[in-house]
Amino acid sequence: MKKIKIKILDDRIGTQFSLPSYATSGSSGLDLRACIKDSIILLPNETVLIPTGIAVYIDDPYITAIILPRSGLGHVQGIVLGNLVGLIDSDYQGQVMVSLWNRGSRNFSVKVGMRIAQIVFIPIIRPIFEIVTNFVVDTERKVQGFGHSGVK
């Protein structure tokens, strides 16, 4: 278990809203809440930056955090992240913000304290690059890229 430092920036966290938490014992992501003063109406195709009321300091270059949309909001409501995936570097100490994008066709109400995204902590491999002129082994795929294997 790795300890990650968290700073509470909104007094409602821990009283009105829970700390970021796992919804189930098998959850990978911790839910993040909208720490806003009033509900916000997010119009179709609009993006808005929502504060979460916390800052994290990972302090380990081999760990990063990613912010992901909540699957129900994305699939059912059309609410996803404006930057698709948020990345929190190990040396960042500012407030965790969530860019919400309404890709749906209806207005969406972001309510005070609503669970809007999830944060996942993952290991990072920091490679040392070896410059080569050719790869020693030819793979079956070689340089075939986007769509080369079809959809069947």
UniProtKB/Swiss-Prot annotation:
Residue sites binding substrate per the record: R70, S71, G72, N83, L87, I88, D89, M97
Cofactors (names): Mg(2+)
One GO MF term: dUTP diphosphatase activity
GO aspect biological process, one term: dUTP catabolic process
SUPFAM superfamilies in alphabetical order: dUTPase-like (SSF51283)
Pathway(s) of this molecule: Pyrimidine metabolism; dUMP biosynthesis; dUMP from dCTP (dUTP route): step 2/2
Keyword line: Hydrolase, Magnesium, Metal-binding, Nucleotide metabolism
Catalysed reaction, written as an equation: dUTP + H2O = dUMP + diphosphate + H(+)
E.C. code: 3.6.1.23
InterPro entries in alphabetical order: dUTPase, dUTPase-like, dUTPase-like_sf, dUTPase_trimeric
A Pfam family hit: dUTPase
Family statement drawn from the similarity comment of this UniProt entry: Belongs to the dUTPase family.
Function text: This enzyme is involved in nucleotide metabolism: it produces dUMP, the immediate precursor of thymidine nucleotides and it decreases the intracellular concentration of dUTP so that uracil cannot be incorporated into DNA.
Protein known as: Deoxyuridine 5'-triphosphate nucleotidohydrolase
Gene designation per UniProt: dut
